[in-house]
Amino acid sequence: MAAPVCVNIQMLLEAAEYLERREREAEHGYASMLPYNSKERDGLKRKSKSKKSSNSRSTHNEMEKNRRAHLRLCLEKLKILVPLGPESNRHTTLSLLTRAKSHIKKLEDCDKRSLHQIEQLQREQRHLKRQLEKFGVERTRMDSIGSAMSSERSDSDREEIDVDVESTDYLTADLDWSSSSSSVSDLDERGSMQSICSDEGYSSSGLKRIELQDNPKITAL
């Protein structure tokens, strides 16, 4: 009786272990077959471990190979981007990385200076824009003042032209009046001269007749 009871207890323990293992495998997402006994189970464990170790080792080797190939490709690209000088083929990986680091530092400094210059130019642009707007307002004001002054000047010029025309009319009238007066005076003088001459002629003719009457010899001649 004791032997069958021990066998039953062993089977119950194995069944319990199997159930616990199935629960753990269900939690992790995988399952395994129920071993027939502990020896077979141990053998399967050893085989699975050896297979896993060989698989992991080959996977690691493949990953390392890919990593080194990617690193070589990156170093070749880095040689193109970083200025190395005439002896670029003799540089080691360490010297290449050191030069790349210093080159990156220079690029960062240049980028900072460029950003500072851009900000300064933007400030100058805003200042010039404000000045341009101010000059535009000032120009508009000066144009309005200039147009007002030109209109006033044109009005004053028209007034001066009117005054000049009126003074010219007065001057021509005075000239006409003086010329008419001078012509009248000339006519008067000419008439007086003619009358004087006629008087003188009349008197001279009278004197001649008197002389002829006094001297009959002259008449006979």
Curated annotation (Swiss-Prot):
The source organism is Xenopus tropicalis
Q: What exactly does this protein do?
A: Transcriptional repressor. MAD binds with MAX to form a sequence-specific DNA-binding protein complex which recognizes the core sequence 5'-CAC[GA]TG-3'. MAD thus antagonizes MYC transcriptional activity by competing for MAX.
* Assembly notes: Efficient DNA binding requires dimerization with another bHLH protein. Binds DNA as a heterodimer with MAX.
Q: Does the keyword Transcription regulation apply?
A: yes
Q: Where in the cell is it found?
A: Nucleus
Which gene is the coding source of this polypeptide chain?
mxd1
InterPro entries given in the database record: bHLH_dom (IPR011598), HLH_DNA-bd_sf (IPR036638), MXD1_bHLHzip (IPR040157)
UniProt name for this protein: Max dimerization protein 1
A single Pfam family, by name?
A: HLH
**Residues in domain bHLH?**
55-107
Q: Which parts of this chain are annotated as the region Disordered?
A: 28-67, 176-202
Name the residue ranges of motif: Nuclear localization signal.
Answer: 21-49
Domain of life of the organism in this record?
Answer: Eukaryota
Q: Which SUPFAM superfamilies match?
A: HLH, helix-loop-helix DNA-binding domain (SSF47459)
Keywords, alphabetical: DNA-binding, Nucleus, Repressor, Transcription, Transcription regulation
Q: Which SMART domains match?
A: HLH (SM00353)
Q: Which GO terms describe its molecular function?
A: DNA binding; protein dimerization activity
Q: Which GO terms describe its biological process?
A: negative regulation of transcription by RNA polymerase II
